[in-house]
């Protein structure tokens, strides 16, 4: 039977990872290693300055752990290299995140980081996120569409094989709409995320300042010379966005011009 490792950044008890397990439990043997507490926006952080403690969850056949103060990357690393080192995983899936992970948000995302860690460890990986609000703001949050999409995607992978080669992963974003409103799937590039750079200053009872970094509204613009629907464009039109991500961040188109610039600097 196929084996799938699940993680997230919303924490072991989050609704999204429960919905993900429920969607896949009849398709594969499911293992879950997730942070004990929410670790949103922790990016690719791994814990190397303090010890990690893994708590085995009772009644889960030894396949569920939560990691005290662990990040999604910690969870995947520990699962593959220690907790379940005897298991050969067919997939790592991170999610279902409560909120989108599109554009440059993928760099901040702990959800995407969980899938990146799976990719680094040599396992085909998927990050999946559920949009919390879009133009249909009165639509109640439901994982029905996300569950259907991940089932279809996993079945396709089990049948045809993983579609990407090398250190690449799939990033999936689910629109906040019903199954009836859903218009299909789009293969998309990342959009250009627009940030507001908000910081909220507060004062505690001792008259000391503290700060909350602002949550940014979902705003974006098209990238230059890009005609495809972006991930943002897809979800606001009730399409599922599927984006291939590459771990290699090298800007190959700039190598030659950078060489010329560097030679000029040395003269």
UniProtKB/Swiss-Prot annotation:
Species of the source: Helicobacter acinonychis (strain Sheeba)
Cofactor stoichiometry and binding remark: Binds 1 divalent metal cation per subunit.
Coiled-coil ranges per UniProt: none
Gene Ontology, cellular component aspect: cytoplasm
UniProt superkingdom: Bacteria
HAMAP family: SurE
Family: Belongs to the SurE nucleotidase family.
A GO molecular-function descriptor: 3'-nucleotidase activity
Main location: cytoplasm
Subcellular localization: Cytoplasm
Ligand binding (a divalent metal cation): 9-10, 40, 97
Taxonomic path: Bacteria, Pseudomonadati, Campylobacterota, Epsilonproteobacteria, Campylobacterales
SUPFAM superfamilies in the cross-refs: SurE-like
Catalytic reaction(s) noted: a ribonucleoside 5'-phosphate + H2O = a ribonucleoside + phosphate
Obligatory cofactor(s): a divalent metal cation
Name recorded for this polypeptide: 5'-nucleotidase SurE
EC class name: hydrolase
